[in-house]
């Protein structure tokens, strides 16, 4: 034991020593076996000029010392270092190598790093201290077999970091045996933010952390960065502007991700992802190895509600395959399209519908496969260029018709390789009906056919007039190409003008039809900026 101790100047030792010498007739006595067990020592030791034990330096120490039956006892050991003090009662048995101590300390824990094995050092290196921790503990073990070391006590920290993430305070019970570190009822403060748990276990041999019944109101990115850079990178796109309420439990790997099995119950907001801005969201997040599952997601969604789920399967290199389903009701068209397409056009109405993506990759939105449906109620949509391109023509037929509100709109659609296809988009208003058939991709490119039916929905007479004026409906069949923000319409067929002569007297707007039907319809209102596809962030 003494061979592990060094000092620049010998310590001062005062006291009484008693021992039994070997018989004078014994010319070759075994001093260790015969004499050392008889030594009795009572005294005081002082090391005023500092020293070291196995590379652990101290500025000074002192203690009463008792030694008998090969057992050292230091009942009032005081150790000084620049940052603080350690007070301990120590007992060490030379025969067995066992030791036991009661310790109160304000020393920097990094001082004991030379005493730890490589795995223990890695755990200690995760923490940096501005102020030394306050520790009261019992410690026991074997001087030559440090893996048998055990500890039980309490720790309080202030102004420290863990994996670079700062905290203003921590209080916890702590136990350590057999390379397993257990924190009992830990409480962490980060300014006004709080975290707590029933328990946190650290298996240093398996390099795993076990979290039991965690609760917090801390920024999620602080927690994920403390877990590890890889998981932080994968969730950084999901941003809570205020810390949510979180319940967390499960297994966290200290290195890698394959053994992760961590559950989050989150409830809070405002929340942002991609271009979406939501005032409130809640749900269950399950991180399982290289997979991430989002279940029971509920959100306030642009004046309405949305629910959904998602699965992500991460691949080497950072990309992920994923699938998701979203169901929305009573969403406001204007605020939703403003966020999705970055437009300021006047758009109104209520939307509800479903979107199910069965296969996709984060590498490209052109990998999307899926399906869904949309429904519109009481909508004003004419400042969406792909609809507004026909507004002038319809107003020429019947003043105001091209600006009337859509009483209802419906469509079902499929998605294949990032191309959306619908064969039944139907938009209705009083006196008019638009039907779209075609495709739209995530770059905003459109390829569709549009039919505009006049008077079909006019009360009482609409269906009759629409049948009588069947040629008028066919006149408004166009092929639409270009983009959502800059569509181009070309007539598919034109009806001979003579077919309108019987209706010129009762329907005065038909007189101006010639000037209102150019061969190429281009949409360029000064108050309608170009739509940007959701792909462009």
Protein language model regions, located:
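Small-residue helix/turn framework positions
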Residues: 1-18, 38-49, 57, 71, ...
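Membrane-lipid interaction segments
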Residues: 22-39, 49-53, 57
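Short, charged low-complexity linker/loop segments at the C-terminal edge of domains
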Residues: 23-26, 361-363, 483-491
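Short loop/turn motifs that connect adjacent beta-strands in outer-membrane beta-barrel proteins
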Residues: 25-32, 146-147, 257-258, 362-367
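Gram-negative outer-membrane assembly/targeting C-terminal domains
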Residues: 487-537
């Amino acid at each position: 034991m003494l061979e592990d101790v060094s000092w620049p100047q010998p310590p001062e030792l005062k006291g009484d020593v008693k021992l039994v010498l070997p018989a004078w007739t014994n010319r070759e006595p075994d001093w260790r076996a015969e004499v050392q067990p008889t030594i009795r020592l009572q005294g005081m030791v002082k090391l005023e000029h500092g020293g070291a034990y196995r590379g652990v330096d101290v500025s000074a120490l002192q203690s009463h010392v008792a030694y008998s039956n090969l057992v050292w006892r230091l009942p009032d050991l005081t150790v000084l270092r620049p940052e603080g003090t350690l007070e301990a009662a120590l007992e060490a048995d030379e025969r067995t190598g066992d030791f036991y101590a009661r310790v109160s300390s304000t020393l920097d824990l990094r001082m004991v790093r030379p005493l730890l094995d490589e795995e223990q050092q890695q755990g200690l290196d995760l923490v940096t201290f501005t102020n030394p921790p306050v520790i009261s503990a019992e410690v026991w073990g074997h001087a030559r077999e440090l893996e048998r070391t055990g500890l039980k006590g309490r720790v309080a920290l202030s102004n420290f970091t863990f994996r670079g993430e700062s905290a203003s305070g921590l209080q916890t019970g702590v136990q350590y045996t057999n390379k397993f570190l257990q924190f009992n009822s830990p409480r962490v403060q980060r300014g006004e933010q709080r975290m707590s748990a029933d328990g946190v276990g650290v298996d240093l041999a398996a390099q795993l952390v076990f979290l039991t019944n965690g609760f917090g109101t801390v920024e999620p990115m602080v927690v994920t960065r403390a877990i590890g850079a890889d998981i932080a990178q994968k969730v950084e796109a999901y941003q809570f502007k205020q810390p949510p309420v979180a319940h967390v439990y499960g297994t966290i790997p200290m290195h890698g991700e394959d053994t992760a099995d961590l559950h989050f119950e989150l409830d809070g907001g405002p929340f942002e992802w991609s271009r979406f801005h939501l005032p409130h969201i809640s749900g269950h997040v399950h991180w399982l190895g290289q997979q991430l599952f989002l279940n029971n997601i509920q959100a306030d969604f642009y004046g309405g509600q949305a629910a959904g789920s998602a699965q992500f399967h991460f691949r080497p290199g950072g990309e992920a395959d994923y699938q998701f389903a979203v169901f929305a009701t009573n969403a406001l068209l204007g605020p939703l399209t403003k966020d999705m397409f970055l437009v300021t056009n006047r758009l109104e109405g209520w939307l509800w519908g479903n979107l199910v993506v069965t296969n996709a990759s984060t590498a490209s939105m052109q990998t999307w496969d899926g399906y869904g449906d949309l429904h519109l109620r009481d909508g004003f949509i004419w400042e969406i260029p792909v609809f507004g391109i026909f507004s002038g023509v319809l107003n020429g037929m019947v003043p105001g018709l091209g600006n009337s509100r859509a009483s209802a709109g419906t469509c079902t659609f499929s998605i294949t390789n990032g191309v959306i296809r619908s064969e039944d988009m139907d938009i209705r208003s009083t006196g008019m009906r638009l039907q779209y058939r075609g495709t739209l991709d995530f770059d905003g490119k459109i390829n569709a056919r549009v039919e505009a039916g006049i008077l079909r929905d006019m009360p009482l007479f609409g269906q009759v007039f629409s049948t009588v004026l069947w040629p008028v409906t066919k006149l408004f069949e166009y092929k639409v190409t270009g983009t959502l923000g800059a569509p181009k319409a070309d007539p598919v067929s034109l009806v001979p003008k003579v077919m309108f002569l019987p209706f010129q007297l009762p329907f005065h707007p038909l007189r101006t039809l010639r000037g209102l039907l150019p061969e190429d319809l281009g949409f360029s209102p000064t108050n309608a900026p170009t739509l940007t596809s959701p792909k462009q962030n």
